[in-house]
């Protein structure tokens, strides 16, 4: 279990100052959770600044290099080999499935642990989808846009004279190969990202509801404890005043009677348990919020890429339908050249945000797994 909980970021600084995932400070306790929630959902939250910071963190570059190496291992002699997604998942997702299962196995099964288990499962499923998308980015580059770029480098620019027949035949042959390439980004109506987002939204709703319940319990205990202290002081004063009249041996009897009447029995362990639950729930809720926002961004980028690639494939089919006509081929190449740079930028943006997802999901899972096993002080004030 110790190895599972010792997920190491790229550097010691990465574990302290580079975390793009907002989460509660352990020292500030439960009192900070409401303020942190407000800061996360605040309309003044500068997303662009946070993203710029996240893309510069050591942990982000560590995850990116690790994923890049893993994907590159699937390319042999320029032939893209479909890798085992589950194997890639075990190398990218930290803490991995085995560590999570071991941690959950040693925790008493309650509604809370069921919610936490659901959180880990959803984050794993979404990471599996993101791994597929990451491979699709490389597939689009390798099979479609690298051959097109090679073709652009051979052909003259728009301002130069018309191409000859040999170049026209070369372009037509390249179009024939590219026409067989399937769009790796499914249409928005068919891919399952929206189901994952719905699961995350439902999970956050359940976590927040459970979080409010735990906070109410601790507040109740806090106020009841304060009330019982005042009641005990009053009882002691009453005993002292009565001591003039009552024999001293009546003091223990009065305390025994006054204690239960002033305050119900509030076990110390109950408050400690609820405070621990609050920290776990807060970590899971914040992680779910951030990850769902990441999925929103990835979802939009995938939708744009699907549309852009479909447009390029339409142009390629149009060029094939017109045959080996020099003028038609040259016009199609002009249109493809114009859309090439925006599409390559979109591929880069999607790749960046998928790597950011890997960074955030690992931090969220590591934080929550640590919270499950972290002793929590009982003196935190709500």
Swiss-Prot record:
Q: Please note every region of biased composition (Polar residues).
A: 30-41
Where is the stretch described as Disordered?
1-41
**Pfam families found in the cross-reference section:** DUF677
Tell me where it mainly resides: membrane
What topology does it adopt in the membrane? Answer: Multi-pass membrane protein
* TM segment ranges: 222-242, 246-266
For this UniProt record, the keywords arranged alphabetically read as follows: Membrane, Transmembrane, Transmembrane helix
Instruction: Give the subcellular location.
Output: Membrane
List the InterPro entries hit by this protein, alphabetically. DUF677
Q: Which GO terms describe its cellular component?
A: membrane
Family affiliation: Belongs to the UPF0496 family.
Can you say what this protein is called? UPF0496 protein At3g19330
């Amino acid at each position: 279990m110790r190895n599972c909980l010792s997920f190491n970021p790229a550097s010691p600084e990465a574990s302290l100052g580079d975390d793009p995932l907002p989460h509660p400070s352990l020292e500030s306790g439960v009192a900070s959770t409401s303020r942190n929630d407000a800061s996360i959902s605040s309309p003044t939250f500068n997303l662009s600044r946070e993203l710029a910071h996240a893309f510069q963190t050591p942990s982000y570059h560590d995850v990116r290099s690790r994923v890049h190496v893993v994907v590159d291992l699937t390319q042999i002699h320029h032939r893209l080999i479909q890798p085992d997604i589950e194997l890639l998942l075990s190398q990218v997702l930290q803490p991995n499935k085995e560590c999570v299962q071991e941690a959950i196995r040693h925790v008493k099964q309650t509604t809370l642990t069921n919610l936490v288990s659901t959180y880990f499962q959803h984050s794993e499923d979404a990471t599996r989808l993101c791994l597929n998308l990451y491979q699709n980015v490389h597939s689009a580059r390798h099979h479609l846009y690298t051959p097109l770029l090679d073709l652009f480098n051979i052909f003259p620019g728009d301002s130069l004279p018309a191409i000859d027949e040999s170049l026209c035949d070369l372009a037509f042959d390249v179009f024939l190969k590219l026409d067989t390439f399937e769009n790796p980004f499914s249409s928005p109506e068919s891919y399952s990202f929206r189901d994952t987002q719905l699961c995350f939204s439902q999970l956050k709703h359940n976590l927040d509801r459970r979080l409010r319940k735990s906070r109410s319990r601790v507040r109740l205990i806090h106020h009841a404890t304060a009330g019982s202290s005042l009641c005990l002081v009053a009882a002691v004063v009453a005993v002292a005043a009565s001591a003039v009249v009552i024999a001293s041996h009546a003091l223990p009897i009065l305390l025994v009677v006054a204690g239960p009447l002033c305050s119900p029995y509030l076990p110390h362990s109950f408050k400690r348990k609820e405070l621990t639950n609050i920290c776990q729930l807060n970590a899971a809720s914040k992680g779910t919020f951030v990850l769902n926002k990441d999925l929103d961004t990835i979802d939009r980028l995938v939708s744009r890429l699907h549309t852009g690639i479909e447009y390029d494939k339409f142009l390629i089919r149009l060029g094939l339908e017109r045959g080996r006509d020099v003028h038609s081929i040259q016009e199609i190449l002009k249109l493809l050249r114009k859309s090439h740079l925006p599409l390559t930028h979109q591929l880069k943006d999607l790749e960046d945000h998928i790597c950011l997802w890997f960074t955030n999901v690992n931090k969220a899972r590591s934080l929550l797994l640590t919270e499950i096993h972290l002793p929590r002080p009982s003196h935190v004030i709500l």
